[in-house]
Amino acid sequence: MSNIPTDLRYAATHEWVRPEGDGVFTVGISEHAQGLLGDMVFVELPDVGDAVSTGDDICVAESVKAASDVYAPISGEVVEVNEDLEDSPELVNSDPYGDGWLFKIKADDAAEVEGLLDAEGYENSIDEE
């Protein structure tokens, strides 16, 4: 079973969300998702300043197996991207919940995060795949 940290919230589309304070949330893809994709070769990140709505495809993770869209788990504005991924996309594989984060969003409504899955809910959604 994949590592599913209990302090994060999850979208059914395998993105995780971590609060950073002041309505800013870090977003990445779960260990389960990176395991399905395999070794990352390129990550196409959104632009800082992009306004996104929940469910928008705003990022692409390309692996040796496939290219997969990454969706905005919450609405808001992209305020930072993980530029380390340009040279080291494999960080998504080696540390998906740490150095492999993708981008940060300033939420339009921070309460939207409460509608995402907790660790148990996300684990159940994986089990149903």
Swiss-Prot record:
Residues where N6-lipoyllysine is found: K65
InterPro entries tied to this protein: 2-oxoA_DH_lipoyl-BS, Biotin_lipoyl, GCV_H, GCV_H/Fam206, GCV_H_sub, Single_hybrid_motif
Keywords associated with the record: Lipoyl
Cofactor note: Binds 1 lipoyl cofactor covalently.
Named cofactor requirement(s): (R)-lipoate
GO cellular component annotations of the record: cytosol; glycine cleavage complex
Pfam families: GCV_H
Coiled-coil regions listed: none
GO terms under biological process: glycine decarboxylation via glycine cleavage system
Lipoyl-binding domain location: 24-106
Domain of life: Bacteria
Function noted in UniProt: The glycine cleavage system catalyzes the degradation of glycine. The H protein shuttles the methylamine group of glycine from the P protein to the T protein.
Assembly and oligomerization: The glycine cleavage system is composed of four proteins: P, T, L and H.
Similarity comment: family membership: Belongs to the GcvH family.
Name of protein: Glycine cleavage system H protein
Organism, as annotated: Alteromonas mediterranea (strain DSM 17117 / CIP 110805 / LMG 28347 / Deep ecotype)
